[in-house]
Amino acid sequence: MAEKLIPSCRGQWFLPARVLREGFLRARPVAVDGGFKLTIGPLTVATRVWDWVYVHYNENATDWLRGMNPPFWEEPCDVLDFLPGVACVNEATFLTLKKKYGSYLHLFVPLRHTRGNIFFGFSPLSATGMAVLKIKTFHGGTQAPDRPGVPMEVYAWETAHFLDAAPKLIEWEVSGTRENRKSAQMVTFSECGLYGSMEGYFYRERATVDICATILADLTGKLLALIRKGIYHGDLKSENIIMMSRSGPGKLIDFEHSHGPGETMTSFWYPDRTFFWNPIGTEAYAPPERSRGRGRNAGVPGIVFQIGLIALNIMVERMERVFVNHTWIKGDGYRAHVLKVIKARGTLDLRGGARTLARVDELIGLVARCLERDPAMRPSLETLVDEFSKI
């Protein structure tokens, strides 16, 4: 009788129930097979650096990797091009990871890492087939409202996922106690996007005006939905948005600076204490009106400003090419300068003649309104969703 197939994550991948139960790891390592070649979808990997996969992972893993076929892979080089990370996971690194965090490897094959604490690889638990395991210190942190023992970061992330504004947080844990909080850690295991971030994606891929406007309208709508739930991301930037496919949608990641509408938060380790939650996550994205004292969060007008910067990153690759220190480099001639940079960098697909150029000019004008120095002059989030949708 054929094995029963069940979806492992929201219907993207279907695996036999036996595979979900048994997992990917071997009960005991085996000797490496000299003829083994790691195959992931259409790509047979030439490097031998990942031969350890055969030693530690069973046929459930290698068969699933071989059969992967997400729609965003158009050619074999996409398999590893889309996978983030700066260094390959070798066997020694894998064994260290397995010793400390082996439960996360049940259905996860880590192949790359960054700084030895962020691991990227493949998992059927992710809708994209790619997943990320992140390990970080957690000696500070805030608590979710009315949810003792749950970090605000997790609460915001799970709420955003419910609103389709964030990738799935598959598993998480906080280790440590109040007494040893300086050595406490948070571990998150979640879905991973293409190239790791929107910044990485649009550094390599060219967008059409349609894709750009659609992504920005969708992102703005998701931020508005989160605010209506009383959640502010706190570190809005291109690096904290991932692309789940070639045309979007964009989804928010890294909620460690998330906060509520007020200026005070409850301490995670000392729930009876509150403190002022002041920081802007990334100074380069701070709006010009941000004060230096308490209440430094961006607020809604500040979020509109940050959306404008994200839009510039899509349009010209790096916002600093046209906009620095809250000011257009070319002053009132910014429209022509932005278009010149777009043409020079090839970051937007300008095919379509005069109609496309008119739409680009309309997009530049809307972004300029987001970047007004006076917060009162910026459009509301509701208006922004509507106007991005009309471009």
UniProtKB/Swiss-Prot annotation:
PROSITE patterns: PROTEIN_KINASE_DOM (PS50011), PROTEIN_KINASE_ST (PS00108). The keyword Manganese does not apply. It comes from the Viruses. InterPro entries: Kinase-like_dom_sf, Prot_kinase_dom, Ser/Thr_kinase_AS. SUPFAM superfamilies: Protein kinase-like (PK-like). It is an enzyme of class 2 (transferase). Belongs to the protein kinase superfamily. Ser/Thr protein kinase family. The keyword Transferase applies. GO terms for molecular function: ATP binding; protein serine kinase activity; protein serine/threonine kinase activity. It holds the Pfam family Pkinase. This is Protein kinase ORF14. Signal peptide: none annotated. The active site is at D235. Its EC number is 2.7.11.1. ATP binds at K134. It comes from Ictalurid herpesvirus 1 (strain Auburn) (IcHV-1). The lineage of its organism: Viruses, Duplodnaviria, Heunggongvirae, Peploviricota, Herviviricetes. It catalyses: L-seryl-[protein] + ATP = O-phospho-L-seryl-[protein] + ADP + H(+); L-threonyl-[protein] + ATP = O-phospho-L-threonyl-[protein] + ADP + H(+). Keywords: ATP-binding, Kinase, Nucleotide-binding, Serine/threonine-protein kinase, Transferase.
